[in-house]
């Protein structure tokens, strides 16, 4: 097994509970949406987010809001929705209403890898890169802002869908100084882990409280960890 020089992390169900996204972030975005649309609809600041939506849904505040509610009810991971969600969450993070509840092992282990092993830590999530940076810039730990510990960020726009092998190849190609076999991808999603492995990365399933139950087949096929501490020093 090649040494690990880059750890690539999923977010939801890996570094923080799925419930934070489903029960805190999503409702916050829905609650903030009507007021934001009313206040920002014609502003240059909001124009890129509005323009990214399909024309048939971007003609009125009511139409756009209805489309957002529909997409979120189906948990569809569409890039223009993810970008808008990040925009809506920004106010909540900045004013202290939102703080990302990282699992207790995450920040200490990230610091350990970075400081003692020289390992690069990067993020790959279906949430937009701006939303990722808001989350890691406003955690419930000390320090709250751990962005300086992270070397790069990937989403479905700059990398591609998370269940496709080509997305992991594209990510590794951006950092050619690290051979793809020296990357470790950690995720709660079995199909993402399989795609990363097909691309040539090492990959483990992270089994956190609140995550979907893993099949016996998945447990046999892949290494499963409950905490980053199980990985130890790299």
UniProtKB/Swiss-Prot annotation:
Leader peptide range in chain numbering: none
Record flagged with keyword Metal-binding: yes
Catalysis performed (reactions): 5-methylsulfanyl-2,3-dioxopentyl phosphate + H2O = 1,2-dihydroxy-5-(methylsulfanyl)pent-1-en-3-one + phosphate
CDD domains noted in UniProt: HAD_EP (cd01629)
GO biological process: L-methionine salvage from methylthioadenosine
Enzyme class: hydrolase
Molecular function GO terms recorded: acireductone synthase activity; magnesium ion binding
Annotated Mg(2+) binding sites: 10, 12, 188
Keywords for the protein's UniProt record, in alphabetical order: Amino-acid biosynthesis, Cytoplasm, Hydrolase, Magnesium, Metal-binding, Methionine biosynthesis, Nucleus
Domain of life: Eukaryota
Cofactor remark: Binds 1 Mg(2+) ion per subunit.
Family: Belongs to the HAD-like hydrolase superfamily. MasA/MtnC family.
Protein name, UniProt field: Enolase-phosphatase E1
